[in-house]
Amino acid sequence: MTTTSNLPEQADIVMIGAGIMSATLATVLKALEPSLKIVMLETLNDCAMESSNGWNNAGTGHAANCEMNYTPPRPDGTVDISRALEVNTEFDLSRQLWSYLVKTGAIPDPQAFIHPCPHMSMVWGADNVKYLRQRFKEMSAHHCYRGMEYSEDPKQIAEWVPLVMQGRSGNEPIAVTRIVSGADVDYGALTHLLIKSLTEQAGFEVHYLKHVHDLARQRDGSWRIGIRDRGSKAQQTIQAKFVFVGAGGGAIELLQKSGIPEGHGYGGFPVSGIWLRCDVDSMSERHHAKVYGKAPHGSPPMSVPHLDTRIIGGKRSLLFGPYAGFSSRFLKHGSLTDLFRSVRPGNVLPMLDVAKDNWPLTEYLVSQVLQSAGHQFEMLRQYYPEARNHDWTHAVAGQRVQIIKPGTDKVGVLEFGTELVTSADRSFAALLGASPGASTAAFIALEVLQKCFADKLTADAWLPRLKTVIPTYGVDLKTDAEACFSIRKSTASVLNLDYV
């Protein structure tokens, strides 16, 4: 049932935010226990209107195939691929969940949200080529990256990505890696599919135009959620046994409103982004890949430049960027006062400490803000030398709010990943951060289960059903090559992806 008013007085679970994270967790919970009464609250008038929206993110099936920030070089010249392996196998969990939903009919057609798309890394210059060659050597030796290809041959690279090589000087060394089993994902379309399926089930409601302004823990351990209807301005409340905050950049404020001790000292640092977008068919049809470069020094991970195939609403386009910037908004539809309202006595010192220790990031963001349109286009031409200005338009990306938290050996730490903050009594969970984000939504949902519903993960409760939804739950795909190959072949078949 989908409504914009008539809130129930009570629910088992309330989810704040109607993006990919809440939709995924609700889907998993209803699959495990269909009798659960779940209410989802969204302040806007539809789901997936912030970072989950197709044009608000890069849509990379984020498997750490091409993102070089996950594979830093060591001082001895070798490459650390441990973080890449973590992200790589986390994406397998999402593929398994989506395959389950396709097989059960909850998602009628996977091509409504996912398409095969090669993932490529590209560098130029002798030192960078040396790094990529070593990276390929180490990654291709691991079963998780079976099928990875490498080339320094301009002719071969031109066959794979002609737009990237056309018009490029042959004087500078260039190298690429390619994995053909990658994907382009429209997380906005996926969120709509998940919520549509949920609304067809008894015990699920999504309510739009509901702004959560208060969270209060009750004596019995439940939560009273104070809500203002953005249309009628009426005040409403709902009581829930468990609250999940999947509100993107808005999660910081809601974590603070909850008052849980575990959230003390947390703050956020917002980073905005701009894409260049090309909808010219003659261009987009000649580029079939996500080509990732190396991030500029001092830049945040989500600012790695890349030239991507995007398929949104059945329309094929090109995307380049992002160009980072600074906005004090925590959400794209948020307020310019978001950052300032988030400052509390408990987080002001961590925030000041982070500001002091991250001058390269500050300088990078300032340089991006001051960058002219001409400078932005010159960056695109490093990846597409013959790009023409009139073929491209600007598109504003979703806001990314990086985590600022108290450190163990310093006052404040800036983190670029995601983090789940949960209460000691397991009645509250808030998801903070940005990258890798949507692609690991299933992994995050499992983390919520393990931290907040551990008593249900037993053989006589949810565990058998969970292994139907996620067949490799409890299996380490980083070490079990046979299980890795088997599940990837299976999910590729169901999702119409390439398998090597």
Curated annotation (Swiss-Prot):
Reaction equations catalysed: (S)-malate + a quinone = a quinol + oxaloacetate
InterPro entries the record matches: FAD/NAD-bd_sf (IPR036188), MQO (IPR006231)
Entry's EC annotation: 1.1.5.4
Pathway stated in the Swiss-Prot or TrEMBL entry: Carbohydrate metabolism; tricarboxylic acid cycle; oxaloacetate from (S)-malate (quinone route): step 1/1
Enzyme class: oxidoreductase
Keywords, alphabetical: FAD, Flavoprotein, Oxidoreductase, Tricarboxylic acid cycle
Parts forming coiled coils: none
Requisite cofactors: FAD
Molecular functions (GO terms): 2-hydroxyglutarate dehydrogenase activity; L-malate dehydrogenase (quinone) activity
Pfam family, any one: Mqo
Gene Ontology annotations of biological process type: tricarboxylic acid cycle
Keyword Ligase attached: no
Family membership noted in the UniProt record: Belongs to the MQO family.
Protein name in UniProt: Probable malate:quinone oxidoreductase
Organism: Bordetella avium (strain 197N)
Lineage, highest ranks first: Bacteria, Pseudomonadati, Pseudomonadota, Betaproteobacteria, Burkholderiales
